[in-house]
Regions:
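Long, positively charged amphipathic alpha-helical accessory segments at protein N-termini or as interdomain linkers
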Residues: 11-166
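Conserved kinase catalytic-core segment
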Residues: 1-15
């Protein structure tokens, strides 16, 4: 499993899900946000075999990757446990361990499509978790709040024609 800023989830380089987050103000005392809301959409299954090759190469599901036996409840429980572990680590040790873990799983050498059609080059995360991008020739830090306005959320299509998310 790998990630692409700001929130695309890949299984074996196929798009499988999307995470969106929003947060409250960051405490100057702890460096942690006062609150955070996380939304996740994950393609659990789908009839990929009948789809065009290009679609199958770009998309996948838990079922396609051999994990279709995992129930929605167990998946949600596992995600919540992992999220709380990393949130606790952030509170106790600062953002650095979270930064390192995320960076190790991030897709490398990626060009990101901005909602207005421009392309941004992915450079990495800064110490506060903002995405560092090269946009219009300039290096910029894009906060979590700004990323929601800058990037369109990927559509988890069931088929090339549907546009419907599972």
């Amino acid at each position: 499993m790998t990630y692409q800023y700001p929130g695309t989830i890949f299984f074996n380089r196929g798009i499988a899900g999307v995470i969106t987050m929003t947060q409250g103000p960051v405490s100057t005392e702890t460096g942690c946000p006062a609150w955070m809301v996380v939304s996740a959409r994950l393609r659990l299954s789908g009839e990929m075999q009948g789809m065009p090759l290009e679609f199958r190469m770009e998309n996948t599901s838990l079922e396609e990757e051999g994990a279709g036996f995992i129930s929605r409840t167990r998946l949600l429980e596992a995600c919540c446990r992992h999220f709380l572990v990393w949130l606790h680590k952030w509170e106790e040790e600062g953002f650095r361990p979270v930064h390192d873990m995320w960076s190790n799983r991030a897709e490398k050498h990626v060009d990101l499509r901005v909602a207005d059609g421009r392309t941004a080059e992915w450079l990495g995360l800064d110490e506060g978790g903002a995405g560092l991008l090269k946009l219009d020739g300039d290096a910029v830090a894009v906060t979590l709040a700004d990323s929601a306005q800058l990037f369109a959320v990927p559509d988890l299509q069931d088929s090339p024609e549907s546009g419907e998310a599972e």
